[in-house]
Structures are given as structure tokens and as C-alpha cells.
């Protein structure tokens, strides 16, 4: 089996263990799966880094049959020296934190307590670097206790043993030579069962890998020589857009900033950051309401921090009536307005319009951004949507729009498009692409979905970059042309209407017209006959007084 197949098998086994203890698709299952998976990843990563440390002591670890035993046998002094030789991006684990140590403790009756204490001790000892935080600066630890999710206390120790059993016979070591694409596919598989944020729930959408790749490549380019870039996602979800963006720039050449209100998303984002080696960005992964309490501010704390790149796949509609008044009281920030609170169906409030404004406000004067929006927005005729459209066209901020296939997102049946912004306003034309007919259909569970093929991704990227007009696919238009069309960013409204001409003789034309007339005459005659027959049948109907 390949390392990818083995990793997927591990995920399946962990999920099966949860199901066996009554937590299959339980609200807490994702906490267990993501944490245990991450624990195993960090355990193996720690061993890998020990073996490759720049220290004479590391040779002893590397040559040992079992690195865990060799590490445990070191004196406290030598162990500390070895730990100090590691990168700050590597969590420090003591011998009693290791999976091998837990394995040897399984016969103890209070193994659930031992297991949980190990988790919390790792989190406490690495809290300085390996924590995220809330908008109120409350630290969110790396790990938490897990066995209490098993309701029956008598089964908790057995549950902990079952989890450890799944970890001992697998190693991530071969995966540490892999790169972004490997971990992106593993992460997508890991969270697919938890990607169920339907009904407009806030910011738990997972952006398909292909869409994230398109957004990153079009914003950054394929060979950009960038350094010290700051990237931001105000509705980060599980971090897919940010991972694609950082990979495109170069993980070592950018810092990631994020915010999201969801506790679940924060846990998964943390996992995603660690899998992709973005440990330094953990401190900027904030849990909290971006619109009400944006955490990332300028140095003086008086305005929003501005970034080189901003990406977002926000919730489209949701009930934010509880905070609407606070947002509406900030007209300078929400310059196009904030949706009113309706009397009914508050869950239909178009919160994405606030996120568009926030994205634009968060871009540097030379910054670029991209945001996923419902396709209906790009042809809006009035309201907040139209005011935003007018602003981004008049200011020359929008430089592209790609309309995606339907059912390409797991959590919404809404047709979506991606808007691209450049605050430097240097584009002469706007490239509009209609990719709605692209994609191959596939079934996931009971859902019929679509995904873009690799060749289709390449076509979208190359057409966009070249600002190329392709029949029934793309068009490059000036800002004045967009204004003449009522500020529409729909590619279809700019396509030329083509009339196909067929070269035929006058005799062929006359014969065709005679045939059409004959067919229509016969059909009209039949229609009249049926009309008379129906009326005759209706006239024959009488009311029967004898039926009681």
C-alpha cells in the first residue's frame, strides 16, 4: 500500500472506532478524529526531526532499532540538549508523551485518565507556540480531553486503548517527504464527513481543491518571486483557500492570518496549518466573529489591518439579526450598506455582501483578492449588491469574474462565481469567464455533484491570464462596456449572437418552405378537429339528479 492509502486506512479505522463506541456521526466525532490524527502526526514528526537533528546525540536515536526507547534512555541533560537543537516549529514531547509509552500503559485500569492527561500535558508544555486564540485573547490549546465523550464511564478506558491500537502499527515518516498536494487530498478526505454545514450555517464551507487552486494561481501566478507576503481569510473555515494561496506563494515566504466564528473550523484549520508546516501562523488563527469583532488591526489598533492577498468563501445567507445593528452603525466600514432584518425568514439575510466589503477594506493599495459569491450577485439590479458592483467597476478594482459549474460545492446548490480584485486598479479590461458548462458529474453519498477536470482548470487559468476571448466561454470587456450593460459581470451578456448561414439554392429554399407550410397546415387542422371534439364532449355532459 502507498502512504496515501495507509493514511486513508488509518482515518477509516479511527472513524470505525468512534462508531463502535456509539459516536459515529456524533457531534463530537470530529474532535476525536482530528485530535488523534494530529497526535499521531506530531508524534511521528517529532521522531523524524530527532533523527535528523544537528546534534551528535541524534545519531544514537537514528541508529536505534526503536527511536522511542533510545530517546527515553537519554539523561535529562542530553535530552534537553537534543530538544534545544530542534526547530521551534517542532513540538517538544517527553518520553511519557509518546504513543509507545501509552501502548505500554494499556493494562492499567485508569488508562482513559492516562490518555487524557497525556493530551493535556502535551498541550500545556507547547502552549506558547502551538495554540490558537479567540478575539478576547483566550488561548485555545492544541489538545483537550477526549474520553469523556463516551457516555458510559466503564467503556472509556477501552475506547482509549482502541484508539492507541490503531496508531501503533502506522507511521507518517514516509509522508514527511510529501508536499502540499498530498496533505491537501488527505485533509479533504479526513473532513469530508464533517462538511455538512448546510442551511447557511456560518463559515464552515469547504472550498473544493480545484477552485482553491484556480483562485491561488490567478492571484499569484505560477512563478512569482514574492517575499514577506501577508495573506488573510476573514471566513477561513478549514483553511483550504489559505493553504492553496500559501503554497502558490511559497510557505516560507508568507504569513497567514485568519478568523472564523466556528469552533469546529478552528480545530480543523489548526490541523491544516500543522500538516502544511505553517506553525508560525497558528498565533494568527483567530476564533471569533469577523464582522462584529475583526481581530487583525493596524499597528495603532484604530483601523483594519491590510494585506497583500485576501481570499474568502463566506456564508452566503444566514440570520445575523442579533448583530445587524452593530454592523449598520459602521457606515464607513460597510459603505454599500448592511442588509435589513426582515420580518420573516431571517436566515435569508445576505451576509456575503458584508464580507465583500470587508475583503475590499482589508486589501493594501497594491493588494489582490478573490471571493466566492452567489452568481446572482453579478447581475444585481438594485440594493446593496448593485452599489457594490458599481463601486468595484467605477474604481476599476474588479479585474475578473469566473462563473463555476453548479453543484461544485458540497454545501450549497447555489450557482457560484469568483470575483477577482486588484486595488492597484491597473487593468484595462475585465476578463469574464463562463465555466458553468464545465465539470464531470460524480456521486458522493446521495448527492449528485460536479468537479472540474485538470484540463478544465488549465483552460480557465490560461484564458484568464491571457485575457482571451473564446466563443461562448470568455470575453474581455472594458469598464465602459460594463457600465453600458448596467454593471453586469455575467460573461453571457457580452457574447456575440451568432447566426448560422446555410448555402442552399432558391429551389431548395422554396421546397423547404412549402414543406413547413404543409406540416403547419396539417397540425392546425388537427388542432381544430380536437378543439371541436372536446367542446362536443363537454356539451354532452348533464347533471344527474337521480344520484344521491
Q: What residues fall within each predicted segment?
A:
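Generic recognition of flexible, low-complexity loop/linker segments
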Residues: 19, 273, 292-300, 358-359, ...
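Alpha-helix N-cap/helix-initiation motif
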Residues: 158-162, 201-204, 254, 258, ...
Amino acid at each position: 500500500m502507498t502512504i496515501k492509502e495507509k493514511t486513508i486506512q488509518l482515518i477509516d479505522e479511527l472513524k470505525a472506532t468512534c462508531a463502535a463506541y456509539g459516536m459515529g456521526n456524533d457531534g463530537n466525532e470530529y474532535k476525536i478524529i482530528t485530535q488523534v490524527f494530529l497526535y499521531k502526526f506530531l508524534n511521528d514528526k517529532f521522531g523524524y526531526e530527532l533523527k535528523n537533528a544537528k546534534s551528535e546525540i541524534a545519531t544514537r536515536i537514528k541508529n536505534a532499532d526503536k527511536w522511542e526507547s533510545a530517546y527515553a534512555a537519554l539523561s535529562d541533560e542530553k535530552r534537553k540538549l537534543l530538544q534545544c537543537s530542534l526547530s521551534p516549529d517542532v513540538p517538544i514531547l517527553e518520553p511519557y508523551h509518546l504513543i509507545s509509552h501509552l501502548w505500554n500503559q494499556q493494562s492499567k485500569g485508569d488508562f482513559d485518565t492516562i490518555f487524557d492527561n497525556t493530551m493535556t500535558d502535551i498541550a500545556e508544555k507547547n502552549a506558547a507556540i502551538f495554540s490558537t486564540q479567540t478575539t478576547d485573547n483566550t488561548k485555545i490549546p492544541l489538545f483537550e480531553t477526549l474520553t469523556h465523550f463516551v457516555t458510559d464511564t466503564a467503556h472509556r478506558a477501552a475506547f482509549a486503548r482502541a484508539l492507541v491500537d490503531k496508531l501503533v502499527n502506522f507511521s507518517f515518516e514516509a509522508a514527511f517527504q510529501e508536499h502540499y498536494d498530498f496533505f491537501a487530498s488527505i485533509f479533504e478526505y479526513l473532513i469530508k464527513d464533517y462538511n455538512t454545514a448546510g442551511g447557511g450555517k456560518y463559515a464552515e464551507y469547504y472550498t473544493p481543491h480545484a477552485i482553491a487552486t484556480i483562485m491561488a494561481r490567478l492571484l499569484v501566478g505560477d512563478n512569482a518571486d514574492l517575499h514577506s507576503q501577508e495573506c488573510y481569510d476573514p471566513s477561513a473555515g478549514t483553511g483550504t483557500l489559505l493553504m492553496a494561496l500559501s503554497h502558490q506563494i511559497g510557505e516560507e515566504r508568507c504569513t497567514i492570518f485568519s478568523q472564523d466564528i466556528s469552533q469546529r473550523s478552528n480545530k480543523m484549520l489548526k490541523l491544516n496549518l500543522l500538516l502544511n508546516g505553517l506553525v508560525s501562523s497558528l498565533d494568527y488563527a483567530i476564533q471569533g466573529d469577523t464582522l462584529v469583532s475583526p481581530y487583525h488591526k493596524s499597528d495603532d489598533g484604530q483601523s483594519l489591518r491590510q494585506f497583500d492577498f485576501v481570499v474568502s468563501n463566506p456564508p452566503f445567507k444566514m440570520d445575523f439579526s442579533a448583530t445587524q445593528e452593530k454592523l449598520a452603525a459602521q457606515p464607513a466600514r460597510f459603505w454599500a450598506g448592511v442588509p435589513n432584518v426582515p420580518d420573516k425568514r431571517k436566515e435569508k439575510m445576505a451576509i456575503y455582501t458584508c464580507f465583500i466589503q470587508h475583503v475590499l477594506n482589508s486589501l493594501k493599495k497594491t493588494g489582490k483578492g478573490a471571493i466566492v459569491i452567489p452568481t446572482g450577485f453579478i447581475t444585481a439590479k438594485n440594493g446593496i449588491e448593485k452599489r457594490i458592483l458599481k463601486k468595484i467597476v467605477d474604481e476599476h478594482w474588479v479585474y475578473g469574474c469566473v462563473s463555476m459549474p453548479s453543484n461544485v460545492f458540497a454545501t450549497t446548490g447555489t450557482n457560484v462565481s469568483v470575483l477577482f480584485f486588484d486595488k492597484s486598479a491597473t487593468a484595462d479590461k475585465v476578463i469574464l469567464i463562463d465555466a458553468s458548462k464545465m465539470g464531470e458529474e460524480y456521486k458522493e453519498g446521495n448527492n449528485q455533484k460536479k468537479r472540474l477536470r485538470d484540463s478544465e482548470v488549465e483552460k480557465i487559468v490560461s484564458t484568464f491570464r491571457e485575457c482571451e476571448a473564446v466563443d461562448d466561454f470568455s470575453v474581455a470587456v472594458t469598464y465602459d462596456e460594463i457600465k453600458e450593460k448596467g454593471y453586469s459581470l455575467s460573461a453571457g451578456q457580452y457574447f456575440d449572437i451568432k447566426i448560422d448561414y446555410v448555402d442552399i439554392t432558391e429551389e431548395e429554399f422554396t421546397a423547404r418552405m412549402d414543406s413547413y407550410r404543409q406540416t403547419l397546415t396539417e397540425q392546425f387542422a388537427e388542432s381544430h378537429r380536437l378543439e371541436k371534439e372536446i367542446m362536443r364532449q363537454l356539451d354532452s355532459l348533464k347533471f344527474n339528479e337521480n344520484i344521491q
